[in-house]
Design a protein with these regions (language model features):
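N-terminal Rossmann-like NAD(P) cofactor-binding subdomain of oxidoreductases
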Residues: 1-198, 202, 235, 313-314, ...
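Charged docking surfaces used in two-component/phosphorelay signaling
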Residues: 184-358
Length: 358
């Protein structure tokens, strides 16, 4: 029997990604959906119409039939007693109150930042720090909840942490410099990024983004010890920019390691991790977690955003970094709306389901 799930924030960009990605899911069945008071009481297909009657479906393809006629509820109308899990796609400051209310009764997998920086909350990337999911049991106990909140990281953190994991574990990465070239869609749709601002332009600053990347990467690569996560002993400097690309974040990364490293051994390491990655075989997992290219023109957003249906992290330009005694540099591409958002959250739920957390 499939697990019964709800999508909260179902009408927004991330909510629509959940709707699409949960279509015909072998383990999860969407039985309840919720959004703001403005959308509540309407059929889903009507809830995403603008005042002129235009359907604002942003994901591509058609709206899945399973959800068109489903009635959108308010948060208060969600019946948690009939749910096994909630996916939270709430994009506003209301996320904290909403997720707190729901987690008292049922597990919540979230794409919001509301709980990321709490001591008893792991920031989980399936395949990277699965062992930190044990902190969810401590969270339940600390807060006297029946459920828990398991957030994804910021979508810019996702690609960096995924590519840094093998370098940190095997080569003792100790310093990282990263510059991101982030897609317009990462800024959301309402209000989103102004077309006048980003067209024929690069915006060299995204508020609060760099602090998030530094803090989250160290937490994700850290170790769970005595009921707490000890952040990884790694120094991170980053510059986050917005570029005129629709979907997918590209990052230029320089890494200093404590041990000798060269491009070929790094490539071999990623290939080894591909063979043993914990999420292999899960419904939303890609065939290859990492794709490493020798072609110096890769990765590119237009070419690589659909690799592994947006769930593969693509790496290229693996080169020796001459600034360090031991170091490497590379480019990465990660799909901010797939692995970095709703579909990554579904993969996380699949991992937690296999661990009997759901």
């Amino acid at each position: 029997m499939k697990k019964k799930v709800a999508i909260v924030g179902v009408t927004g960009s991330v909510g629509q990604e959940f709707v699409q990605s949960l279509k015909d899911h072998p383990w999860f069945e969407v039985t309840q959906i919720a959004a703001s008071e403005r959308s509540a009481g309407k059929k889903y297909v009507d809830s995403i119409k603008d005042p002129g009657g235009i359907i604002k479906w942003e994901v591509g393809g058609e709206i899945p039939e399973y959800i068109k006629e489903m009635t959108v509820k308010t948060i208060d109308e969600i019946n948690t007693s009939e749910l096994d899990l909630v996916f939270s796609a709430v994009e506003s400051e209301a996320a904290r109150d909403i997720e707190t209310k729901l987690a008292k009764d049922v597990p919540v997998v979230s794409t919001s930042s509301a709980y990321r920086y709490e001591d008893d909350v792991p920031i989980l990337i399936p395949g990277i720090n699965d062992e930190q999911s044990e902190l969810l049991e401590i969270q339940k106990k600390n807060r006297n909840w029946k459920g828990w909140v398991a957030p994804l990281p910021n979508c810019t953190t996702t690609g960096l942490a995924i590519t840094m994991k093998p370098l940190y574990e095997k080569y003792g990465a100790k310093k990282v410099m990263m510059t991101s070239m982030q897609a317009i869609s990462g800024g959301g749709r309402s209000p989103g990024v102004s077309a006048m601002d980003v067209t024929d332009n690069i915006i060299p600053y995204i508020p609060k983004e760099e602090e998030k990347v530094r803090k989250e990467t160290r937490k994700i690569l850290g170790k769970l010890k005595d009921g707490k996560i000890e952040p990884a002993d790694i120094r991170i400097s980053c510059t986050c920019t917005r570029v005129p690309v629709i979907d997918g974040h590209t990052e230029s990364v320089f890494v200093e390691t404590s041990q000798e490293i060269d491009p070929q051994t790094a490539k071999k390491t990623y290939e080894e991790y591909n063979k043993s990655i914990s999420v292999m075989g899960l419904p939303s997992a890609p065939k290859d977690y990492y794709a490493v290219h020798d072609d110096p023109t890769r990765p590119q957003p237009r070419i690589d955003r659909n690799v592994g249906d947006g769930m593969t992290t693509t790496i290229g330009r693996l080169e020796k970094e001459e600034l360090f005694d031991h170091g490497i540099k590379y480019m990465l591409f990660s799909h901010n709306k797939k692995m970095g958002s709703a579909k990554g959250a579904i993969l996380l739920a699949e991992m937690l389901y296999k661990k009997d957390k759901i």
